[in-house]
């Protein structure tokens, strides 16, 4: 399965064109807000990218739920203006954007964010207006339960991810992409990217602190599913999904040991979906069921 997993990672990794599109979209949104709040053109210092596009753990194909998460930094005066009316700030952000992005029904403000939806197959942008504090955390508006301001620390996970990814020689990023694809392929599974990444970092710290080494991805994924399954409560809705996935992973590994590459790839496709490549053939067996020679070699040579 080594080549299958190599091709699988290529299949789910965003193309350069898709990454460029994401950058164009979030820079456009932040540039629009720069003109509105600062009367200036796009300023890199006024935004903070976080989430999967910061980590580069985003996957394809791009679906309608896939957003670029970005903080837009407001100044102190704007915060004071909306200190007692956090919902008002979200509406001002929305109104500023609708002058540029004229499909106003596709720009929505709720909770803590303003979501700008673009065409199908393109990146949406989820922007959080935020006041940066002296300790490098942010205050963000929350319109729920009467409205409030909350402390948000996206840098903590960004730093944790970068440290883990460097230590594991990019295994953190690769495993995150694959497991995100599993979550996406499991339609009724509710497993946030934030929690998933935390679990991956903890798992790798315990099992693969120095990276993959010579261990194949099938073993790592099976161990990760078992690791999380053993740690979630029985009442956790993820429990049954984890059990199903780890059983399929175990079946795939056993098939692979038997040289049944086709059956192994089919089990992995049940876990990851059609982005995981099919194997075309199994290993040949002789009549005794042993891989290798069709007949025993004759050390005495031909007579």
Regions of interest found by a model, annotated:
Residues 1-7, 235-303:
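Terminal (often C-terminal) interaction modules
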Residues 43-46, 112, 236-240:
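Residue-level recognition of the N-termini of beta-strands and the immediately preceding loop/turn
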Residues 1-65, 77-87:
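N-terminal regions immediately upstream of nucleotidyltransferase
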Residues 19-25, 65-75, 80-126:
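Histidine/cysteine- and/or acidic
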Residues 49, 58-61, 74-79, 89-90, ...:
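Extracellular/secreted glycoprotein ectodomains characterized by long, lumenal stretches
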Residues 17, 21-23, 27-30, 102, ...:
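Catalytic cores of NTP-dependent nucleotidyl/adenyl transfer enzymes across multiple folds
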Residues 6, 66-76, 154-160:
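Glycine-rich, often proline-containing surface loops adjacent to acidic residues and nearby aromatics
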């Amino acid at each position: 399965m080594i080549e299958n997993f190599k091709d699988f990672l290529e299949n789910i990794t965003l193309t350069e064109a898709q990454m460029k599109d994401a950058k164009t979209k979030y820079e456009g949104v932040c540039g629009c807000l720069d003109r509105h709040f600062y009367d200036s053109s796009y300023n890199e210092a006024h935004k903070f990218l976080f989430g999967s596009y910061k980590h580069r753990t985003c996957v394809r194909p791009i679906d309608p739920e896939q957003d670029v998460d970005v903080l837009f930094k407001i100044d102190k005066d704007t915060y004071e203006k909306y200190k007692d009316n956090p919902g008002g700030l979200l509406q001002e952000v929305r109104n500023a954007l609708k002058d540029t992005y004229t499909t106003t029904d596709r720009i929505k403000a709720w909770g803590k964010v303003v979501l700008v939806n673009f065409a199908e197959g393109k990146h949406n942008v989820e922007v959080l207006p935020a006041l940066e504090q002296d300790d490098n955390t942010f205050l963000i508006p929350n319109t729920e339960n009467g409205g409030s301001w909350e402390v948000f620390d996206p840098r903590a996970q960004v730093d944790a991810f970068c440290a883990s990814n460097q230590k594991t020689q990019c295994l953190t990023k690769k495993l995150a992409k694959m497991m995100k694809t599993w979550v996406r392929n499991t339609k009724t599974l509710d497993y946030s990217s934030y929690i998933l990444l935390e679990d991956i970092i903890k798992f790798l710290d315990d099992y693969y602190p120095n990276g993959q080494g010579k261990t194949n991805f099938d073993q790592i994924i099976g161990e990760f599913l078992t690791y999380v399954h053993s740690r979630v409560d029985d009442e956790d809705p993820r429990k049954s999904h984890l059990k199903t996935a780890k059983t399929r992973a175990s079946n795939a590994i056993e098939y692979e040991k038997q040289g049944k590459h086709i059956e192994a790839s089919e089990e992995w496709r049940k876990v990851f979906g059609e982005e995981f490549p099919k194997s075309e053939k199994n290993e040949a067996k002789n009549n005794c069921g042993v891989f290798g020679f069709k007949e025993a070699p004759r050390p005495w040579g031909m007579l």
